[in-house]
Amino acid sequence: VHTVRFFPIGNADTCLIELANGRRALFDFADMRESGNVNDKRCDLEKELRDCLGDDKEIDVVAFTHLDTDHCKRAKEVFHLDHAAKYQGGDRIKIKTMWVPASAVLEEGVTGQARTLRTEARHRFLEGKGIRVFSRPDALDDFLKKRNIDPATRRNLITDAGTLCPEFNLEHDGVEFFAHSPFAEHCDGEVIVRNDSALFVQATFEVAGRQTKLILSADVDYETIDSIVRITRRNQNDHRLEWDIINVPHHSSYNSLGPEKGNNETAPTDNLKWLYEEQGRALVQLASAGALLLGRRFVKAASHAPQRLC
């Protein structure tokens, strides 16, 4: 069977997908636990991940949906990064293919973990291997041209919204990933808003002819989701927004439902109401990394209680 694991890390995101054929995809890595604090209920994410990997020291795909700390904390301490020797060796976990939105390559003025991961993304993109960049804004072509690289030579590393990611397919892996966002316009402005330009995908798993669908939505806001729904329905691709499990956007923030925060409930826009109330299928589970800690009625986000897809 395939397994999807959500981890109890509070207002942050990490999701590990383990396929029946042994391949893995990790969406974000945010080790938020305060070391040494016995009262911190968040899990030791590095330990949990290493326990899942066992003797393996490489993950097929590691996706950083965007470069906010609550999606990449301690990544540079845990993963082997190709661009600098100080991030290599020891028992660091290797990344076969890194998935990032174009904003992770283009954003300027970043610091800390974000700067390190941006440097790694740029290095892999310029080298032409080990990376997939989502969306193709004009600024990405300009980035390459300034470094004397013909953009046409990197087209195979770029996936546009509305297309499948080539690293996995249903026939051989029992899963396919459909990219909904970011759109090129999200990554083409002078000021990049990370949440708006984050990676939003639908994973379709198949076992013995039965499909299970998962939506991973990062921290996108209601306007971005509204656009995704509008474009998907216009193209008659409603099935690409069906879901059995959905990772609640932005750690359950009201801003991922509608423009105004309600006193008890936030009213969704019409398109979001359609997504959440009509597109959920038989299994219908909502996942939040903070659910286990806060007692919310979502699927428990614990590595010892994974969602088995069969």
What function would you assign to each model-found segment?
Residues 11, 263-267, 281-284, 289-310:
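C-terminal regulatory/interaction regions
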Residues 29-43, 252-268:
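Acidic/histidine-rich helix-loop elements
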Residues 10-13, 44-48, 229-235, 264-275:
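Alpha-helical scaffolding within the catalytic cores
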Residues 215-216, 225-250, 254-260, 277:
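Extended hydrophobic/aromatic segments used for targeting, binding, or gating
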Residues 1-58, 197-222:
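Conserved beta-strand hairpin/beta-sheet module of binuclear metal-dependent hydrolase folds
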Residues 37-98, 235-255, 285:
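Active-site metal-binding motif and surrounding structural segment of the metallo-beta-lactamase
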Residues 11-13, 67-73, 104-108, 221-225, ...:
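Active-site environment of divalent metal-dependent phosphoester hydrolases
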Residues 1-2, 57, 73-223, 295-296, ...:
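Flexible, acidic/histidine-containing loops and adjacent segments that form or flank the divalent-metal
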